[in-house]
């Protein structure tokens, strides 16, 4: 009987503590995030607000570079930044706007199409570039200066030239993709694809899975997924705009890693901490996995000693609970 009372008391203490913690997290939590995180973050938002009913998560999707520039260039306030490439945070935010980040997810490049795309029954991982270069085929990618998927598309093309041993393949692919086929973020391309204005788009595998669209898988040597081919990925690069006007940053090919951070001037620091803990914790990881986006488990903190102590402690022991 005593053990039953003891168990009941412990359960009460746990539930009371959880309720009190939820009551402490309130208010708006503004999240600027990559377009490719839109579907999983919408589900995370719903689950998070259910756990913390006093909160209101306000999300804005954009290309990761554009999302960061809302803070660095436009002076807007955000509580959380979710980037499709950790180097965007490194290159554009550190050290002025944040000093740390957490790597939490991976992805890979694919070529997405529809049932109405030209030559959909012919295209495969060996001949995709030949199909795309046919005169009646339209293909697109996102803007490299606004979105990591854009410069990753360019890096894939450069790697393809080496992998398939086709002279001038990068130039041919670039020359045959007019400006009208380029959009600010990768998810903007989906509307053009569904409208039949584009036959193929370069996009993340998770986005193709979330929209239940057919896609061509690319060889691991060029899809920017595998650490096994990191050295080969690094043989290709693409220049994008930097922090200052006229400055350029060289993006080196590497396996894809998504990252989270909190800007130094976040209005709702406690809400931001709670949201990041939720994303990198078991519930958030499960939602990411369900949406075709592999999680990094355990998540990897970079310069984490400069992050809020609660996040440091969570990474040390709580992220896998």
Swiss-Prot record:
Gene3D superfamilies, alphabetized: Periplasmic binding protein-like II (3.40.190.10)
GO function term, MF aspect, one: molybdate ion binding
Domain of life: Bacteria
Matches recorded under SUPFAM superfamilies: Periplasmic binding protein-like II
The keyword Metal-binding is assigned to this record: no
Keyword set, alphabetical order: Signal
Range of residues in the leader sequence: 1-22
Pfam families reported for this sequence: SBP_bac_11
One GO term of the biological process aspect: molybdate ion transport
Assigned protein family: Belongs to the bacterial solute-binding protein 1 family. WtpA subfamily.
UniProt protein name: Uncharacterized solute-binding protein Pmob_0379
């Amino acid at each position: 009987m005593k053990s039953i009372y003891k168990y009941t008391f412990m359960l009460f203490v746990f539930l009371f503590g959880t309720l009190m913690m939820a009551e402490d997290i309130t208010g708006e939590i503004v999240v600027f995030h990559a377009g490719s995180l839109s579907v999983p973050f919408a589900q995370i938002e719903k689950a998070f607000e259910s756990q913390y009913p006093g909160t209101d998560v306000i999300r804005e999707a954009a290309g990761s570079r554009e999302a960061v520039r809302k803070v660095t260039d436009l002076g807007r306030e955000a509580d959380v930044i979710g980037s499709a490439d950790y180097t965007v945070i490194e290159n554009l935010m550190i050290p002025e706007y944040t000093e740390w980040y957490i790597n939490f997810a991976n992805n890979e490049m694919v070529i997405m199409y529809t049932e109405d795309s030209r030559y959909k029954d012919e295209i495969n991982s060996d001949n995709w570039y030949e199909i795309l270069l046919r005169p009646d085929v339209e293909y697109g990618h996102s803007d490299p200066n606004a979105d990591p998927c854009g410069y990753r598309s360019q890096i894939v093309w450069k790697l393809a030239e080496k992998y398939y041993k086709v002279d001038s393949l990068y130039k041919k692919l670039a020359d045959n993709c007019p400006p009208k086929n380029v959009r600010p973020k990768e998810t903007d391309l989906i509307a053009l694809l569904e409208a039949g204005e584009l036959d193929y788009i370069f996009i993340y595998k998770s986005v193709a899975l979330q929209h239940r669209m057919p896609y061509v898988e690319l060889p691991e040597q060029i899809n920017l997924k595998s650490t096994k081919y990191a050295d080969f990925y690094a043989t290709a690069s693409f220049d994008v705009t930097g922090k200052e006007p006229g400055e350029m940053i060289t993006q080196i090919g590497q396996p894809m890693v998504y990252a989270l951070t909190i800007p130094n001037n976040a209005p709702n620091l406690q809400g931001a901490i709670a949201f990041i803990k939720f994303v990198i914790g078991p519930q958030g990881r499960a939602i990411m996995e369900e949406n075709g986006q592999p999680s990094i488990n355990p998540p990897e903190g970079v310069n984490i000693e400069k992050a809020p102590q609660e996040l440091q402690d969570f990474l040390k022991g709580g992220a896998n609970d």
